[in-house]
Amino acid sequence: MITTQSISDIRAQVKAWRQKGETVAFVPTMGNLHLGHITLVKEAKTRADHVVASIFVNPMQFGQNEDLDAYPRTLAEDQAALTAAGAELLFTPTPEIIYPKGMDAQTYVEVPSISDLLCGASRPGHFRGVATVVCKLFNIVQPDIAVFGQKDFQQLLVIRTMVDDLSMPIEIVGVDTIREASGLAMSSRNGYLSAEQKDQASQIKRSLDKMAESLKAGLAFKDIITQAQTELAEAGFRNDYLEIRNANNFAIADAGDVKLVILVAAYMGSTRLIDNQVVTLNA
């Protein structure tokens, strides 16, 4: 696998592949890779002739009191994992390469409405940072396909909307959440949890499963949410949000909706965890 910080190197290699009529899939990451990321790379490998990955801890999507400096950097381990998974080209730019004028002078991309809800309300400016860097990476790599995890459901929706609104010729693929044996969604931030906290955090998946069954049984949304909030609090969580929304348009769920998504964000200690579950009801 070739690793480079050079935009021109990335473009030259992708151009060479394209001249041979070959396709390119792209997996953007922030590094500190786990099995969830590797699953994305393997999925990308099944969908295109070549896989490009990136590792960039994007300062634009971190808030003032968030963990940018503490975010783990594990490049050597990540390179080995990406090579084993089948990636052929790795882009590892610095902030100065991505934002040569500095972030304050950077043209940005903002997806209205959905960027201000849920994680966007808790983390103002977060999705502007995500959309801007993903748009820039797409322009650098120019992939046919880009692969993302569905654990970040709102992020995936923001990216799909951006691609559609800006008429980008890129297929966006969402991959099911990969979980630890306990049911806890794999996340780089799980490394901040103690063994006891990890055990407590597995309550998220149990509550999501219970909520899904209650939705299928026709129970009232408000009652379902209240019960789950109680369960999570008893497990040691501090609630950020727990909502049921229409999975297609992200509106607050209505009784007539068929495809729903349950979205949760909660703190275990100082670590913020997110998860979701899509539920399809009988029409």
Swiss-Prot record:
The keyword Zinc does not apply. Its EC number is 6.3.2.1. (R)-pantoate binds at Q61, Q155. GO terms for biological process: pantothenate biosynthetic process. It catalyses: (R)-pantoate + beta-alanine + ATP = (R)-pantothenate + AMP + diphosphate + H(+). Coiled coil: none annotated. It is found in: Cytoplasm. Keywords: ATP-binding, Cytoplasm, Ligase, Nucleotide-binding, Pantothenate biosynthesis. ATP binds at residues 30-37, 149-152, 178, 186-189. Belongs to the pantothenate synthetase family. This is Pantothenate synthetase. It comes from Shewanella halifaxensis (strain HAW-EB4).
